[in-house]
C-alpha cells in the first residue's frame, strides 16, 4: 500500500498546481544603507516574488539636525545651536521584471538655516553639530496595499 501511494504521488506530482505554493514577496537581502558625503543617505534594495503589478517604493524618515555658529577664528559659538527638523520622503514607481525590483532611493538632509538666520553676522559660518535620520523605513506597495516593509532604524551622520 505504501509503495502504491508513493508511486501515485510521484506520478501525479507534476500535475499538482504550484500556484498554492507561490513564494511571498520579500527582500532578497537586507536593504543596504549608504551615508553620503553630502550628508544624505541612500538605501539600496532588491526584492522578488512581486508578480507583475507596478510597485510603489517609498523611503521615509524624520530628520533632526543641530546647527552651530563658527566665528572667523574657527571657534564654535558657546550657544546651544539651532535645531531643525523635517519629515523626509522619496518614492518611485517600478514595473517588476520577472517579479523582481531593485534600485535605490536617497533622502536629503533637512534644509539648514542660513548664517544670517542664526549667527551674529555674515562673517561667521554654520557647522552641522549633529544630524540624525530617525525611523528610516522602506516600504513597497502594490495597488495601495503594503506588500513589504523594512524598518532600518536610526542613522546618524
Language-model regions: role of each:
Residues 10-19:
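C-terminal segment of classical bacterial N-terminal signal peptides
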